[in-house]
Regions:
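Acidic, small-polar-rich N-terminal luminal/periplasmic segments of exported/outer-membrane proteins
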Residues: 30-173
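Long, low-complexity, polar and repeat-rich extracellular regions
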Residues: 16, 27-28, 32, 203-205, ...
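Extracytoplasmic loops and strand-loop junctions of Gram-negative outer membrane beta-barrel proteins
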Residues: 125-127, 145-146, 174-177, 212-216, ...
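Structural signature of outer-membrane beta-barrel domains
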Residues: 44, 92, 119, 168, ...
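Transmembrane beta-barrel wall of Gram-negative outer-membrane proteins
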Residues: 175-273, 298-317
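Cleavable N-terminal targeting peptides that direct proteins into the secretory/outer-membrane pathway or into
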Residues: 1-30
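Short, flexible loop/turn elements at secondary-structure junctions
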Residues: 3-5, 16, 102, 182-184, ...
């Protein structure tokens, strides 16, 4: 009887503890519950509640991005309903398909935007689709994916999928994050981000990453290397705000289209490109101009994107919002079977 009484007391104690924990968890969940606001698909990017949007839009915030752990920008789009993604030849040059729109490759029905401005208007150019010109890191606050709806009017005439990446912004409290990532294929990556207040009503966010790797399929040299640095400055005004951001990216990775692997004497985990076979010289134009090509440079994005916006509110509900974006050099090399 004593044994049974002890078990009953233990059961009561456990039940009480679980009930208390459940109550605390419910209270915390209630405190953390916030309404999702979307800006994609609205005139001038004016935020509305997601529940009030009359079109299909997906929100993925920074915490969800960490959980999904995408291997590339295009890989993140797998979380969007109605979107199918394949990596094709590597981190760059993915194929992105949108439900209801026919396509044979690349990403003809995808537009990638940053802070509401399209990064690059051409949806496909020699395997150089939109996601090849953008890298995800800890400076991203959220990604919004708008399928159809007002896309043709409020995007760059895109009837399919428009994805909008919004950068983190500074606040009154200074905070930061440092992250180191490694893998069984010798990936070495360091991410960092810091945000805070410079002076009254002037806020900053800076961050980026540095990485290197011989690749999942060992190339015999550092075939995947890159870095990125982002600055975002926001000035709050009495009747609006000013925002400016710039992002410098130099990130390239090996790009292999399908090659024979199930062949005697060939190691599928190692590429035969090596350091001696990756050099080539090609001749173009009527004057046979020579170009030295190094396949080790891979495919990627070498350049920078800068942009900004001004938002002003006036009497009687009038608003003025303007955005700008500029981008520069793209260089890319890859090995294609043929």
């Amino acid at each position: 009887m004593k044994f049974n009484k002890a078990k009953s007391m233990l059961a009561c104690a456990i039940t009480l503890a679980l009930s208390t924990h459940a109550a605390v968890a419910a209270e915390q969940a209630k405190e953390k519950k916030v309404e999702r606001i979307v800006v994609s698909g609205t005139p001038a990017g004016v935020g509305i509640r997601k529940i009030d949007a009359s079109y299909a839009v997906t929100n993925i915030d920074s915490s969800q991005i960490i959980k999904l752990s995408p291997k590339s920008t295009a890989d993140l789009f797998k979380a969007v309903p109605g979107v199918w993604v394949e990596s094709s030849g590597g981190e760059s040059g993915a194929n992105v398909f949108v439900r209801g729109f026919p396509g044979g490759g690349d990403a003809p029905f995808l537009t990638l935007s940053i802070e509401g401005s399209p990064v690059y208007p051409a949806p496909t150019l020699s395997f150089l689709e939109n996601s090849s010109l953008f890298r995800i890191d800890e400076t991203i606050e959220t990604m919004e994916a708008l399928r159809g709806g007002p896309n043709p009017v409020l995007s760059n005439g895109q009837p399919g999928l428009t994805t909008n990446f919004r950068l983190k912004r500074g606040g009154e409290d200074t905070q930061g994050l440092f992250k180191y990532t490694t893998s069984d294929y010798d990936l070495q990556r360091v991410d960092a981000v810091v945000s805070g207040e410079i002076t009254d009503d002037l806020y900053f966010m800076v961050g980026g990453y540095v990485k290197s790797s011989p690749g999942i399929r060992d190339a015999g040299f550092t075939s995947e290397k890159g870095s990125q640095f982002t600055i975002n400055i926001t000035k709050e005004l009495d009747n609006g705000e000013l925002n400016f951001y710039t992002r410098q990216t130099d990130d390239h990775g090996a790009w292999y289209l399908p090659t024979p692997l199930n062949v005697n004497g060939i190691d599928a985990e190692y590429t035969q490109l090596g350091t001696l076979n990756r050099q080539a010289t090609i001749f173009t134009g009527p004057n046979a101009q020579a170009h030295d090509i190094d396949l080790g440079d891979g495919r990627g994005w070498d350049g920078h994107v800068s942009g900004g916006s001004i938002k002003l509110e006036f009497d009687n509900g009038w608003q003025f919002i303007d955005r700008l974006l500029v981008y520069f050099l793209v260089s890319t090399f890859g090995m294609q079977s043929g």
